């Protein structure tokens, strides 16, 4: 008897909690529900695609800057990490862009980057840096290392230094002396004429002192 009583009690509780079926909508319309489901799924897929696109874009823009060692590939800074399947328009654009890049590579470079850093400009056709292998000069072992010494009998002898020019000075001939005397006389006449013309001009002779009174 106790079991039948408890079963009746559970049934009465279930009946009291379940809402009454309204009389207006007897059965739900299957076409209306499927339309709502389709609209909701479409909205969700559009928002998910938008979100994915935004995530992709931010991922491309916020990639970390490379270290100094990898600055050679700066063109890949804003490119995606994974290669997406390219359509024919992308391939055409890549070909168009590559044609310009190849043209730029074919043009001769004005100078090397080392020249831009050092300020050195090299003529066209010459290397910007001298190859040390081509600059090896054969040193003559017999010549002394220092210009202050002369090799005399296999021994180094200190050279006498003088400021005189070692070129051979020839003594002037009588004709050259006469020409020089003629030039000196003309020079003296010109000086005298200038002195007469300007007045207080005085040309100091040799061993003559100016005495102010």
UniProtKB/Swiss-Prot annotation:
Signal peptide: none annotated. The keyword Nucleotide-binding does not apply. Blastoderm. Throughout the entire cortex of the embryo although the distribution is not uniform. It comes from the Eukaryota. GO terms for cellular component: adherens junction; cell-cell junction. Keywords: Developmental protein. One of its GO terms (biological process) is cleavage furrow formation. Actin-myosin network stability during cellularization. Might be involved in increasing actin-actin interactions or membrane-to-cytoskeleton attachments. nullo together with Sry-a and bnk may provide auxiliary functions, by acting both to stabilize a large and dynamic microfilament structure and regulate its functions. This is Protein nullo. It comes from Drosophila melanogaster (Fruit fly). The lineage of its organism: Eukaryota, Metazoa, Ecdysozoa, Arthropoda, Hexapoda. The gene is nullo.
